[in-house]
Amino acid sequence: MSSTYKDLDKIFLIGAGGFLGAICRFSLCELMESYYGTLSVNVLGSFMLGLIMYDTEYIGFIGPKGKLAFGTGFMGAFTTFSTFAVQSFTMPFFPALENISVNLFLALVGVFMGRSTIKALSGREV
């Protein structure tokens, strides 16, 4: 198979994952107010990306194609740094500071929890 076809395969996987991730983000944000919807997708996305990245490194259940589809495609479209930035920019100073602090802290906690889950499942030091 030529490299062009391999690249098309990767592009399709990322695009399909992105399509589903965008739909899921839209659906979840429609259920909540904008601030809470954005916070929810970013924290959930950080947890899920933590699972995906550490799984591909230590367990291998997802595999390279799954990492492209779910890690790059789905999570790239599901999470939304730009919406978080615009929402923070348009808020008064102290609510914006709270929004920034809560988003960053909980996103890092999400990655930590994803990593901890993989560590527990693999039985290895991660």
Curated annotation (Swiss-Prot):
**Entry keyword annotation includes Chloroplast:** no
For Na(+), which residues are the binding ones?
G76, T79
- Organism per entry: Methanosarcina barkeri (strain Fusaro / DSM 804)
Q: Name one GO molecular function term.
A: metal ion binding
InterPro entries, per the entry: FluC
> What does the UniProt record say this protein does?
Fluoride-specific ion channel. Important for reducing fluoride concentration in the cell, thus reducing its toxicity.
Name of the protein: Fluoride-specific ion channel FluC 2
Q: Which family does it belong to?
A: Belongs to the fluoride channel Fluc/FEX (TC 1.A.43) family.
**One GO cellular component term:** plasma membrane
NCBIfam families, sorted: PRK14224.1 (NF010820)
Catalysed reaction(s)?
Answer: fluoride(in) = fluoride(out)
